[in-house]
Amino acid sequence: MLKKDYLCSMEENKLFEGLKVSVLDDGLQVVEPDVLVDISTIAACFQDYGHHPLAYLINRLKPSANTSPILLGNFAGTALDQIIHDPEADFGDMLRASFSEQALQFCTCEDFNPVKFKTDALRQVNNIRQAVDALFTEYDRNKALLEPSFVCKALGLRGRVDLMTSDMRLLVEQKSGKKWGSYREAHFVQVLLYYGVLRYNFQLDTDSVDIRLLYSKYPVSEGLLDVANNDALFREAIHLRNLIVAMEMKIARKGFSSVLSQLQPDVLLQRQEKSDFFHRYVRPEIERTLQPLHSLSTTEQDYLERMVTFIFREQFAQLLTQDTDEELRRGDMVYYYHKDGDPDLCHHILNKGMIERIDDEEIAVWPNDNRQETPDILRKESYVIEPATSDATTTAALRSLMAFCGASPQKRHLLMGSLAPRQDTSQRLSRSYHPAYDDILLRAKQAHDYFLLQGPPGTGKTSMALRFLVEEELSSHPSHHLLLTAYTHRAVDEICAMLEESGQDYLRLGSEAACDPRFAHRLLSSAFNEKPKLSDIRQRLERVPIVVSTTLTLLTRPFLLSMKHFSLCIVDEASQILEPYIVGLLSSDSIDRFILIGDHKQLPAVVAQPDDDPRLHSCRLSLFERLLRQEREAGRKEFVGILQRQGRMHPDIAAFPNEFFYQQEQLQPVPCPHQLETGLDYLEPSEDALDEQLKQHRVLFLPADDEASLVVDVLQRLYRQIGHERFDAAHSIGVIVTYRHQIAMIRREMARLGLSQLEEISIDTVERYQGSQRDVIIYSTGVQDHDGLDFLTANCFQEDGHTIDRKLNVALTRARKQLILTGNAALLKQNKIFSVLIARYSI
């Protein structure tokens, strides 16, 4: 026994080699404390049969569960929230609120029994009322906080508690299931880690915090339990956290193959006295999870190993490159907390929410899970808002890859390229849609497995191509169902706008906070009246012909595919989605065929990790780009379409991108009225030479050392030419920059000159401008040195001997009527493409 422990210790020491270890004042060792691990996921590893770090990995590989006990647990959380805020809260209102929040889960839960659920839920409510009354005879109810979050960089932990008070005197973790004795070890570990966070973040001792476990299945006398501190178990939990971090960093450094052989069920059995229980109940479930990993071909195993390694490398690379100054946008998860000094996540009770609306004046945050805020929170006057980090996207990618591994061999072989896609040439269009689109629409319809549609800037990929694809599918097969998805909330909003305009019936998945208010009535949670019937909602979901969602929502809530079959899935923005995040969805047996719409010549998905491992280079590609290359290498053209008619850029603006980036595609104007104009509609008299240049040239490069001043000067001049009556901040002018700090510099210069009329114009980075357009674009390159030039021109690739600069392509193709560029000419000319650009458009 001693020998075995000694060997384990040696193995652990080897695992920790090269990692940063922080030693706290009490001697507690924390490996890589900057890596934050969720408390609940650590606690979930503590089972009767052991607590092995591989259990953490296996839990990340398991498909998302959707069971009646989980639904009941979520309901209990909703009930606790409502009872805290209103002691007389109505049971029916609680049921409706929970149903609204989890409509998709209720509809797709296979073991759901409405009668039993209602009985169990009522018992939970009665017990919660008793517990709340008991707790708040001693504590101040107005100080109650529901689901406050914490980040502890001393321990490398993050998490959220079900209930506590703002004075930190009370901490309660709620469980809706069975106790199995006094309480489960996993639940004990969870509250011990929460207490550890309070101790190390706020220097609280055990006597100052009342820690309780609330088992709301039981009356208060049996279910509300005091929890005493157990330092030995707490340290064991931190040790497991260290092993988890070390294991995942090992995968990132040495590859998934370094642990793959250890992913066997018996590894998790550490307590032999529990072997009967383990082999009877636990082992079969683990085998079902892991079986696909061990039944892949050599090629598929190599693919999986590379992709999983890439995902873990990306997880840690994002940690190193995360920036709290990163610009927030609608749909982002954030922490917000009371500002009472310098911002510091670790020394505040955090609230978690989603950005609902954001502009220069205001940020509206939707509290997590529609929680009600307590009086103690609402009376605060000033808040700090910071991005909320999460491993959810990494876990979603892992589960997506596992879904691919468990897919049918035919689907796997198709996506791996060992099986050629099929075509049914007997298919014909139901009607003619548009001469520029009919050939592509026909070939897309004839594609039996997949079709790739390249949509360069301004070619109407959503407003025209996607609309026609939807109309053709439903007119030819009225009983068919479509799944439409995209990477960003904005793209999903654009899809919804197209469907509204074309009069289609559809549902949108996701939260109200992330949805444009124009389409909130299409959310599943809005699709029923005040007293919904599960059968009605399920029928609505089953019958609706179109479902729209972001790809991340489909990854994290894959339950839809268990009840609804789709003849066609169309993925917009497909060139911005890394392969692991989409391959599981597209290999599902619930989807017959798919169409990917994208443009590999625009900016791809952001990858944080360096491109220093040749084996992982292909992992940086989207599935769209990989399949596009695959089709070209196979010499097949029938499964690829290119939209060539663009209605955005005036031909003078399109000339340079056409020559340098779209040599094969050769984009042509539609032409729209503004594309036929011979001159710019600037009628005010020129006051100097620069005014005259701006009036005469559609594309113009202006050298500048102080770019912010020049940009604001040009903005003033263009505003005068456009005129107050015609100026529209959302359409007239936009400013594109390379770095975020340029935004602040330009805004400060505008404020200094008192240009309030220009406050509403969009000033943003190239990455954020992708998908947008303005009549006039001003592009401030912001390059001051060779490193900056390298950064500016880093997103390039070679195609047919030509260099395609994706970032420059996106910047140039946002403008409809005029494009103004500025920057350090001498430095920019050291790049071949910029050198030609400057020579061609300088005066």
Regions found by a protein language model. Give the residues of each.
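Metal-dependent nuclease catalytic cores that hydrolyze phosphodiester bonds in DNA/RNA
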Residues: 1-166
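Pre-ATPase regulatory/linker segments immediately N-terminal to the P-loop/RecA-like helicase/translocase core
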Residues: 54, 214-220, 228-246, 325-442, ...
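Accessory interdomain/linker segments of ATP-dependent helicases and helicase-like nucleic-acid enzymes
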Residues: 1, 249-348, 696, 710-711, ...
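Metal-dependent nuclease catalytic cores in nucleic-acid-processing enzymes
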Residues: 182-214, 332-336, 340, 584-588, ...
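Walker A/P-loop NTP-binding motif
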Residues: 462-477, 494, 498
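Conserved helix-turn-beta segment of the N-terminal RecA-like "Helicase ATP-binding" lobe
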Residues: 490-522, 749-755
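Mg2+/Mn2+-dependent nuclease catalytic core
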Residues: 2-3, 7-10, 141-239
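Conserved helicase motor core of SF1/SF2 NTP-dependent helicases
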Residues: 479-480, 486-490, 538, 552-555, ...
